[in-house]
UniProtKB/Swiss-Prot annotation:
This is Amoebiasin-2. A motif (FG loop) lies at residues 105-114. It comes from the Eukaryota. Cysteine protease inhibitor. Inhibits cysteine proteases CP1, CP2 and to a lesser extent CP5. The gene is ICP2. The lineage of its organism: Eukaryota, Amoebozoa, Evosea, Archamoebae, Mastigamoebida. It comes from Entamoeba histolytica (strain ATCC 30459 / HM-1:IMSS / ABRM). A motif (DE loop) lies at residues 71-81. Residues 1-16 form the signal peptide. Belongs to the protease inhibitor I42 family. Coiled coil: none annotated.
Amino acid sequence: MKQFIFFALLCTSTYAAIHILTEKEDHATLHISFNDLIKIQLRTNPSTGYAWNIEYPTDTFSLSQDTIKAEPHPSGMVGFPSIREIQLKPLKVGTTTIKLGYSRPWEKGKEPLRSLTYSVVIR
């Protein structure tokens, strides 16, 4: 009987999918479940002074990861591109927008070099 209950719980447990967004999905509408995660992967090059700035409603998402991973490159090479990974976990059901801008923080009032917008529907 215990094995049956364990198996039934295992079959009905929630599955958290990870939805990956890149620059290619700019202006896309993403439909996700409440238990899913969003992972945004963007190329960046910190040596240029540019950085991705993210805007999202903090009552709708929590930031669960924000890392920069160097792309493979020859040893000793500097100024090589990296991948920034931002992972968000939904906090509530609804429709919202995530915006990103690639800019230099000291260049106030200047438009970002690149801008991305994702619409997200959380069910």
